[in-house]
Amino acid sequence: MGVGAHHDAPECGMENVEWRMKTGTDTVRAHHDAPTSHTESTPQGPIMRIVSLLPSATEIVCALGLEKELVGVTHECDFPPFVRQLPKVTRTLIPTEASSRAIDELVRERLTTQRALYSLDLPNLEALKPDLIVTQALCDVCAVAEEEVRAAACLLPGTPKVINLEPQTLTEVLASIQQVGAAVGISSHADNIVAQLTARVEAVSARTAGLQHRPRVALLEWLDPPFSCGHWSPELVRLAGGVEGLGKEGQPSRTLRWEEVLSWNPEGVLIACCGFDIERTLEDVPALWKVPGWLDSAACRSGQVYVVDGSQYFSRPGPRLVDSLEMLAHALHPETHPLPDGLDPAFRIAVPHF
């Protein structure tokens, strides 16, 4: 389902609601430590109390210049940095300190038995008195389920408006910014933000148009077990001048066998584990060297294996997805794509030689 496929008004009238979660200046660049800057004029929309239930929505709200209207966020919202101080209305029920294999097994088991991955703090949500709640229905693993949020909204005073973000592609990610802008009455301002982001995407695409060689790329969203990338990420690889042969544009990520990865023989590997920063991802990397045939892959032989902050970038469908594109383009074609000021490069791993 695409962006805006669900109605804004929560479907109320339910009785005996069971709380079960079946399971994120003129140039917009969100990798600074201050709240994202916005265009010339401050958006003039109605004062609202906004609660964001996914990190990408939090970044969208702030990119639109609505930092002061944001009153509540999730336990995972961490950018811009000031949002870490806002009241939290969710918590995870999965031990994040567990191994990647254990996390994967726990998530699969809970989804199979329809047990919660997250809990929603209804008393805190009620105390925040939101006018607008931004949620998602894209991924059962990434955030509180949309139907759970709509059920909660029906129990809150005033029945706040609920909007659902469900982007599958980069175009739909940018459209979700306009969706939030329309919900708060600043459509024109949102259009300006999207135009700026689109110009950056087009600049990358223009530079890749004349490339003589597009390397085979494996963008991995998990390592144990390995997962392909999905949704917008294969599109990012294409726009950055690569070819993604394991993930499909606009489709969910999927579990892989290492034999599949090695059969693709990627010339470049980008590891962007969903929900993990670089430090946490690096804990899993040594196991790669033990995968039979891995060190003989084209990427390892040429030293083109990178780790990025998957939590902050590639798996967060907000304004910084364009940063992700620029980061990826620089990693694949550094001479063609200079790294923009203020954006850290992908971390290149030293491949061991046994």
Predicted regions and their residues:
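Extreme N-terminal basic, low-complexity initiation segments
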Residues: 1-9, 14
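Detector for intrinsically disordered, low-structure N-terminal pre-sequences
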Residues: 2, 16, 27, 44, ...
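N-terminal ligand-binding lobe of clamshell/alpha-beta domains
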Residues: 41-354
